[in-house]
Amino acid sequence: MMDTKILVVDDDPNISDLLKIYFENEGYDVKTVADGVEGVNAFKQYEPDLVLLDLMLPKKDGWQVCREIREISAKPIIMVTAKGEVFD
């Protein structure tokens, strides 16, 4: 599975480290970045097969990152957030 690359975009180092450890233990190649601008740039350079994307990010929020990625790719994006309600 090392051919499968996952990009984790999350500003909480505890969450990004946990996801990285979990997916690397399952055999995936994982890259982590901590803000929306880095997320878009890393997507273009790293060319991941899957993106795990936090909603609340510094510099550029998860919705904007998702829109920018969607302009260039249809790769799967899973939104990861601590928000508990739709209206949050």
What are these model-predicted stretches?
Residues 10, 34, 57:
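Conserved acidic carboxylate
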Residues 1-5:
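Non-catalytic signal-transmission and effector/linker regions of two-component phosphorelay proteins
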Residues 27-34, 42:
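Short hydrophobic/Thr-rich beta-strand motif most characteristic of the beta2 strand and flanking loop
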Residues 35-38, 61-64, 69, 88:
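Acidic catalytic/metal-coordinating carboxylates
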Residues 16, 58, 85:
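The feature encodes the CheY-like receiver
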Residues 44-48, 68-75, 84:
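Conserved phosphotransfer cores of two-component systems
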Residues 17-25:
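Charged docking surfaces used in two-component/phosphorelay signaling
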Residues 54, 81:
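Active-site residues of response regulator receiver
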